[in-house]
Amino acid sequence: SQIGPMLALRDQCAGGIRLAARALGTTDATVLVYRHISDSEVAIPRNIGGIPIKRVGGKYPAQCQMEEELAERYSGKGSWLLCGACAMIHLYRAAVEGRPQTTTFVTVAGNCVGFPRNVEAPLGTPVLELLKLCGLTERPTRVILGGPLTGTATEDLRNEKVELSTTAVLAIRDDKHEYSYTCIGCGRCTAVCPQGLNPMRILQELRRGNRRAVEELGIEDCTQCTCCSYICPSRQSVAGEILLYRQKMKGGEEP
């Protein structure tokens, strides 16, 4: 939900970037766009409002790699700030037009949506109304708020409202039954972890209740990208159990 608003409202986006740069006391600003977004999907210009666009590579979760690249690029040269395009649009509206943020940009998609699109929705809009607006074609088995990997499922569509943090609404129907098998020790979760952790070992120690081992294995470094759960052939809820542990620890509960 960043590319669409950036291209549709490029003047506001560029204006917001300039305001942010001025506040930081710099003129060095660049728009970063993932290289895998081809021009056949959407035409990406070379700049917006005179601010250059740079195509960057990397795989999911690309933000982590992007932050590492920026940290290396500006090492010893000063600090940097990474902001979303939609945030820059709202910054421009607030600073130049005096409009407080009362809307947010939401991607509405999924195989139950007839006309997927980016919608600028007022805060507090019922999620069900967004789905109706974009042509809900059949009853979904799952509705996810947020991305397909890191989003959260909801069942109360009438009372679930659009919030500032709502980036996407995905209505999905699948006939697959949920299942999980015993871990086969394939090591795929370790291979895909962008933080270099061993999710399989962390999960084993979590289930044993070995808190010390869990901490030593670096559970606090987990970014909750859920790559481990996605790649697992046994459908183990690796990321889910790690998140539950961290939530309990944060709340002062005994995991």
What are these regions (language model features)?
Residues 1-39, 46-51, 56, 60-62, ...:
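Iron-sulfur-cluster electron-transfer modules
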Residues 5-15, 24, 39, 83-90, ...:
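Conserved active-site and cofactor/substrate-binding residues in soluble primary-metabolism enzymes
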Residues 6, 23-127, 133-138, 147:
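Hydrophobic alpha-helical positions that pack around
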Residues 38-46, 153-161, 233:
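Short glycine/threonine-rich loop-to-helix capping motif typified by GTGT followed
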Residues 70, 136-184:
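Active-site gating/interface segments in enzymes
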Residues 107, 118-120, 144, 170, ...:
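Structured core elements
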Residues 168-180, 190, 194-230, 234-255:
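Ferredoxin-type iron-sulfur electron-transfer modules in oxidoreductases and energy-metabolism complexes
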